[in-house]
Amino acid sequence: MPVSMYWATKDDTDYLYTKSSSNDNGASIGPRSLDTEKQLAEFTQTKGELKARIQSFDAVIQERAGLYRRLRLPSLPDRQAEILRKLDIEELLGNDLLVVGTNAFVAYELFVGAKLPTGNEETEDFDLAWCRGSKVSLATLLGNTPAKTKTLFGVLKSIDSSYRISPRKPYQAVSSDGYEVELLAAPSTHPLPKNEAFDPMASLIEQEWLLKGTAVNVVVATIRGRAAPLVVPDPRWMALHKLWLADKPERRFDKKDKDRRQGNVLLDAARYFLQASHPLNIDFVLELPEELRHLFDGWCADSGFVPES
């Protein structure tokens, strides 16, 4: 449906024009006639009906947003949500990109249906993982090839033109006010498309584990009551990823305790709430690489948990 239809006069003749976007110069359908007048009337009627539906939906959204706040459900800052909505519109979220790091714990809380004692702390940066072509990519699962029009960096620039790729950290984009967006990528996903400005490190073997299992998809409300989609890694693999990071020698010391707490909490959540969708069974154990097996065994020993067949 065009964004607008209007009459324009040329050489004493009225022509019906349409615009497919706000940046469109407009294209003529033809001179005024019974047919073009009918087209304009149908467009005007349809547009009016859609506006009425949108107003009705807005009222429902405001009502649900109020309920969401009263229930004190987890929410995202609006800045991050704006990025997520745009990535979703451009068919990048879930197909090419997963949300990782602390921001992912908002999704885990909603998916589990319980307040997690750690993990969902506010953060001033935004971490994404490249997943195109992996088994967790929605496009791979559905056998689709989305018609992408923008890259991750292109999406960021469309939201805030001040974003620049950091000269010191080519995997990071920074806005003029210091907001950071980082792109991480598993070695198996390299090289990235040539038109993507981000250049993530190719040596992060731990990113491979976030491309396993079954990703989680939720819709979360923002602080202002708007909606945003979240697609995050399998909570079991994220848990062990976090426990591995806590033992990684190069990891910043001030992050290690948080990593360990987040990992343990996610495994507990999977144990008690996600038996049907993300079971900690023998099949899962057999998938674990050597680097993660001892971490899972340690958690089992501490928790008194025995995987079922």
Stretch-by-stretch model annotation:
Residues 1-14, 21-309:
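Compositionally biased terminal segments of proteins
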